Amino acid sequence: MRMYDLITKKKHGGELTAEELRSMVEGYVAGEIPDYQMSAMLMAIWFCGMTAEETTALTIAMADSGDRVDLSAIAGKKVDKHSTGGVGDKTTLICAPIVAACGGRVAKMSGRGLGHTGGTVDKLEAIPGYETAISREKFFSIVNECGVSVIGQSGNLAPADKKLYALRDVTATVDSIPLIASSIMSKKLAAGSDCILLDVKTGSGAFMKTLDDAIALAQTMVAIGEGAGRRTVALITDMDTPLGHGIGNSLEVAESMDVLRGKGPHDLTEVSLQLAENMLYLVGKGTIEECRRMAEQSIADGSAFETFCTMVRRQGGDDAVLRDASKFPQAAVQMEIRAGADGYITAMDAEKIGETSVVLGAGRETKDSPIDFAAGLILHKKYGDAVTSDDVIATLYTESTQRGESAAQLFRAAITIGKEVPPSRPLVYARVEKDKVVRY
């Protein structure tokens, strides 16, 4: 079949068959279909959309373009979790060991951060000695032993997605729900878990800025997962303001350990528990209510924290920093930011705060940028809090005063202080299952 004919069919709103989509993906990965033709197809998809059947078929073809991870060597049902990305979003470090401590199996392949959103692999590499690149055999062995292992993504996981994403990035076709959904889910399907929980963020620090768009993306991804035979559920969670208080790699690890020891901030604890209870529900550990009680108990009895420490030791990491965060390498410069006015914090732009952390050295401006694991910021005040002019609302951590001053300017632009108490916002907006959306 000719690519020209497929482009023409989609341009006129036609539905591509699974065979046509597979031929297209295989031809593009093999270099037989040029970028200019694939660019035309991407734009046709952007304008005309795709049916659920098309999107699922495209995703499966992308997942089949590289390695498929066979997790059958791991006993029991495996559950994966994916976040669409946010600021201060360290929930994998919390919900994965909770699920493992409750008898679930989490074989997690995570990515690095780029732009204003952080990556789980970068956070874990802030732990001295922690290895994110280990053999498949060791990966499986650790999951069988302690229920969880988190490693970096394989270089050959869904290579079609890597190639298509690079093209979407330069052809203004990133913001297409079928293309976003197939990009995310192709990697999830290739990663091999039986069940998938999706954390779809919405708000200023998220890719999907509106609730309706976030729900539409979640519905599409859930339909793909279910269509590919994976039990899939999505939660829509808030990312209008950062999650928790710490932003930056070692700072986020330390805060995650606070949550696992029952001492973490309410927002981060609650979102992590809701994610964990749904992961446990997906692998059949009980009703949502029963799974919630199990998750809470794993924090109360210390088993979730000890599970995380065991995983870290098995992957070469020093768990002393998990027990005492002062043992992490410390930033050379600390800078306090004061409110400068009396009132209430009425806006805390998560995207700008994420960009602040990048300027401080905690994130990447390009994929090859080095990371300062000690850099970042701690928020002492959050959205809705009352402040006086002299209150310290954040502390910045970085390697130089120059970086700190540049970041401080950006941070101040992210904060709005008003005279009225702002309306409260839910942490979780909705739960999306196959053919069902429950709004909270």
Describe each region flagged by the PLM:
Residues D5, K10, E15-A18, Y28, ...:
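Well-ordered secondary-structure scaffolds
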Residues N144-C195:
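Phosphate/diphosphate-binding glycine-rich loops and adjacent basic-rich segments that engage nucleotide
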Residues M109, V143, I151-S154, I184, ...:
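Short beta-strand segments
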